[in-house]
Amino acid sequence: MALRHDEFYEHAIAAADGDRRLPLSRMTGGDISPFEPDGLRVSPLRPPVLPEPARQGEDPSDCDACGRRGEGIWFDARWRLTRIAGVGVPLVLMLHPRDHYDMADLTDELAAELGVLTTHLVRHIQALPNISRAHVYRIGDGGAHLHIWFFARPEGQSQLYGSWLVVWDDLLPEYPADIADADARIVVDALVASYGGSRAAD
């Protein structure tokens, strides 16, 4: 059984200094970290808060994602794909179920579809010129409606490896939208050809 919230906090705070700051880790000192260790400080570790704040869309009647089920760049009967604007990496796409599900609520059939769709999207993103890898993330702490992130890592940018990619994305200047739109169209055309679906909602 996982540590209770108070046990976890006590375990973590035992490694912190008098200001509740944990030491810098092997990741923050690594060569792919966006931050130089000199002068870098860890934020104080705050005590746990229970109950946790409700996520957006916990009530399906007030779910933003459900209200946008007809918006996107690709659709089939059960899934939709959107492009996230204003990012720093070449392309960020998001896959959503059109109906209200979180990951643990998916039927086995929908879970199988998610696996196949994820594989097709990774193939098509990685086939884009000048893209080395498609990173895939499911977090879910902010929204109760399942959303899967696909980040395209630019070729040759070895500092953007691993889980730091999302931090680099936040630091980088906004990527040209016209290029991202064109690449998103290439991915969607390939997805329609390999998996099905269409550019327009039903």
What are these regions (language model features)?
Residues 93-117, 171-176:
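Short histidine-centered catalytic/ligand-binding loop motif
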Residues 19-21, 26, 31-39, 154-202:
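C-terminal helix-cap and adjacent tail motif
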Residues 129-142:
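A short glycine-rich, hydrophobically flanked beta-strand micro-motif that places a catalytic Asp/Glu
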Residues 146-153:
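A short beta-strand motif that forms the metal-chelation/ATP-contact edge
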Residues 75-81, 113-117, 141:
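Glycine- and small hydrophobic-enriched segments that form the cores of compact globular domains
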Residues 112-128:
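Active-site helix/loop of acyl-thioester processing domains in fatty-acid/polyketide metabolism
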